[in-house]
């Protein structure tokens, strides 16, 4: 459900946290200008991020109109290095009450892991609505998130993207379904066990002169190889429709082994780069799905972070943090440090 809010003369279309879902077959609303999630943060974002866009345009125009008489034969200032961006992909394991490994037991461990890691972007998978609110609370006031349930609205699992509001401002975002009818809510036409989605966000980097980039976050099906391959093809097609001048970061649980699955080959064949392979420095590798069992060194990776060419990966790690033998999830989060230019 969406509500039209007017604040400071700005009209915003905002998702209502009713949990209600549109009727089956409904077409997904155009979310491209919905830049934040619910409540007061939406209004604050409108007051902060929209003027940034106008200011950037004004500053650019003012610069080009500078009097020619001011030009002097001075040396050009050296280019400043791009600030590094820390990105994590993390399958949260959906919240449940079953023991062992209930959400109540895992939540404090996840809170501590995220507080230690502090990435600026976290692409998550499997999060349920209340679980996402818990993580939002635990991350604190400097983080926000964007996401839609795969059943529409706040229903069922999400591919929510968390981000540090001190560093990043969302410009636009969108969620589509991995099916033959991507704009139809809950659509599932490739034999997947569940509807599958991609949430992408176009961010402005406040620490890098307002430069923009995309993050696309997804969770491929665990049952159908056909669905995984079709999902990879559609994801590559949608990424190709992004502004080609902007960097792209892709996060996700792909339920496919890197280097061993056609879905992986499709995405890398489209020009994307596997940050784990490209990293200048790498931590130890494990199977990223461990199922709360002993970690498997040199195991297969189903959780990846990919980028467009030209992005530098300085370091890639898998976070093995646990407390008293309790892991925060049945997956290991993967984190990379990037320079987008």
Predicted regions located by residue number:
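Structured beta-strand-rich core segments of catalytic domains in phosphoester-bond hydrolases
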Residues: 121, 125-212
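Solvent-exposed loop/turn segments at secondary-structure junctions
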Residues: 92-96, 127-131, 150-154, 167-168, ...
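N-terminal, active-site-proximal structural segment of metallo-dependent hydrolase catalytic domains
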Residues: 2-45, 53-137, 151-156, 341
């Amino acid at each position: 459900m969406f509500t039209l809010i007017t604040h400071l003369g700005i009209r915003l279309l905002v998702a209502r946290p009713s949990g209600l879902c549109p009727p089956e077959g409904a077409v997904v609303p155009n979310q491209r200008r919905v830049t934040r999630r619910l409540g007061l943060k939406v209004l604050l974002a409108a007051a902060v991020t929209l003027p940034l866009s106008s200011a950037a345009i004004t500053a650019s125009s003012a610069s080009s109109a500078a009097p020619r008489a001011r030009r002097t034969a001075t040396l050009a200032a050296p280019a400043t290095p791009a600030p590094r961006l820390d990105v994590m992909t993390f399958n949260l394991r959906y919240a449940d009450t079953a023991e062992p490994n209930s959400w109540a037991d895992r939540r404090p461990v996840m809170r501590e892991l995220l507080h230690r890691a502090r990435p600026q972007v976290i692409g998550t998978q499997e999060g349920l609505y209340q679980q996402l609110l818990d993580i939002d609370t635990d991350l604190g006031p400097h983080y926000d998130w964007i996401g839609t349930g795969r059943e529409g609205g706040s229903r069922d699992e999400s591919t929510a993207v968390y981000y540090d509001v001190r560093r990043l401002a969302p410009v636009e975002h969108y969620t589509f379904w991995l099916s033959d009818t991507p704009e139809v809510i809950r659509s599932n036409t490739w034999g997947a066990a569940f509807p599958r989605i991609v949430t992408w966000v176009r961010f402005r980097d406040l620490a890098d002169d307002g430069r923009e980039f995309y993050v696309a976050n997804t969770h491929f099906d665990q049952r159908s190889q056909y669905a995984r391959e079709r999902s990879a093809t559609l994801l590559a097609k949608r990424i190709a429709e992004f502004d080609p001048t902007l960097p792209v970061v892709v996060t996700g649980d792909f339920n496919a082994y890197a280097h061993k699955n056609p879905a992986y080959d499709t995405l890398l064949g489209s020009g994307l780069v596997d940050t784990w392979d490209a990293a200048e420095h790498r931590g130890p590798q494990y199977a990223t799905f461990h199922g709360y069992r002993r970690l498997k060194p040199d195991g297969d990776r189903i959780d990846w972070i990919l980028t467009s060419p030209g992005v530098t990966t300085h370091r890639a790690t898998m976070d093995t943090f646990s407390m008293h033998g309790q892991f925060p999830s049945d997956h290991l989060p993967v984190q990379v440090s990037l320079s987008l230019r």
